[in-house]
């Protein structure tokens, strides 16, 4: 597991109040991890802060799974 992947999973677990082992790559924030729309906004903000990136709204809407978040950060990290 890469450092980025590990950090992303830790942030998701903390933001959504789920156990780390529930945060698997294919998990959907809403369907599998019980996030609502406010949770997903807060999650995006936490990822932006941790990785010092900006996630535009149109991109944030596409980030619906753990893997999508990891992929976005790998692609856009400075």
From Swiss-Prot:
Pathway(s): Lipid metabolism; fatty acid biosynthesis
Q: Which family does it belong to?
A: Belongs to the acyl carrier protein (ACP) family.
The name this protein goes by in its record: Acyl carrier protein
Give the CC-aspect GO terms: cytosol; membrane
Listed GO molecular functions? acyl binding; acyl carrier activity; phosphopantetheine binding
Q: Which residues carry this modification: O-(pantetheine 4'-phosphoryl)serine?
A: 37
Q: Which Pfam families match?
A: PP-binding (PF00550)
Q: Does the keyword Zinc apply?
A: no
Biological process annotations from GO: lipid A biosynthetic process
Keywords from the named record: Cytoplasm, Fatty acid biosynthesis, Fatty acid metabolism, Lipid biosynthesis, Lipid metabolism, Phosphopantetheine, Phosphoprotein
Q: Where is it located? A: Cytoplasm
Q: How is it modified after translation?
A: 4'-phosphopantetheine is transferred from CoA to a specific serine of apo-ACP by AcpS. This modification is essential for activity because fatty acids are bound in thioester linkage to the sulfhydryl of the prosthetic group.
The chain positions of domain Carrier read 2-77
What function does the entry list? Answer: Carrier of the growing fatty acid chain in fatty acid biosynthesis.
Under PANTHER family, the record lists: ACYL CARRIER PROTEIN, CARRIER DOMAIN-CONTAINING PROTEIN
């Amino acid at each position: 597991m890469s450092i980025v992947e590990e950090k992303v999973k830790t942030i998701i677990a903390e933001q959504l109040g789920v156990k780390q082992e529930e945060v698997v790559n294919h998990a959907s924030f809403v369907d599998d991890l019980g996030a609502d729309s406010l949770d997903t906004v807060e999650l995006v903000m936490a990822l932006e802060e941790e990785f010092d990136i900006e996630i535009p709204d149109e991109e944030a809407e596409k980030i619906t799974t753990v893997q999508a978040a990891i992929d976005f950060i790998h692609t856009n990290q400075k």
